Amino acid sequence: MLAPETITALVAGAVGIVVAIIAVLALDRLWPPVLQREFTVDLPLEKAWQHLARVEQWPSWAKHIKRVELQPAGELGLKSTGRMLLTNGLKPAWAVTEFNPYRNWKWVGGFLWLTIYYDHRFEELNPTQTKITFVVEAKGLGVSILGRLFAKIYSKNMDRAIALLIQEMNASRVQ
């Protein structure tokens, strides 16, 4: 038979675990992590779309990406799937789930057991400028903790990549 103080400690521990699980689930639903970046390039909408849609060329500006494999090869579309080889050795796979030419495309991938949604949005500001918005959202158990960790790490790569992408896209307008 267990001593009363042992039973009390076990019950308190179990209650603590239940409260922690409820807190994580509540955070997951109420405050899911979202990473969003908006920037403007000096290209018409169509040219900005075409430039970014060449995902196999992303390593030229996204230095954390070594290689992008697109299936089927060629143009990005609703049936496209892909895999990236990252400089840290990871090989995340993704599939396009939404494709609205010159407006947005969204692909879905994974990180551990989380599902990550990457939205690439385009908005014409005027005939020579386009606003591009990247939105990264995560869903899954523990997203309030793991999603924030993913966002913290990924945001640094994203900020460096966007700066290089803007330079590359703006330089392409004179060619």
Predicted regions and their residues:
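Alpha/beta-hydrolase-fold catalytic nucleophile elbow
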Residues: 135
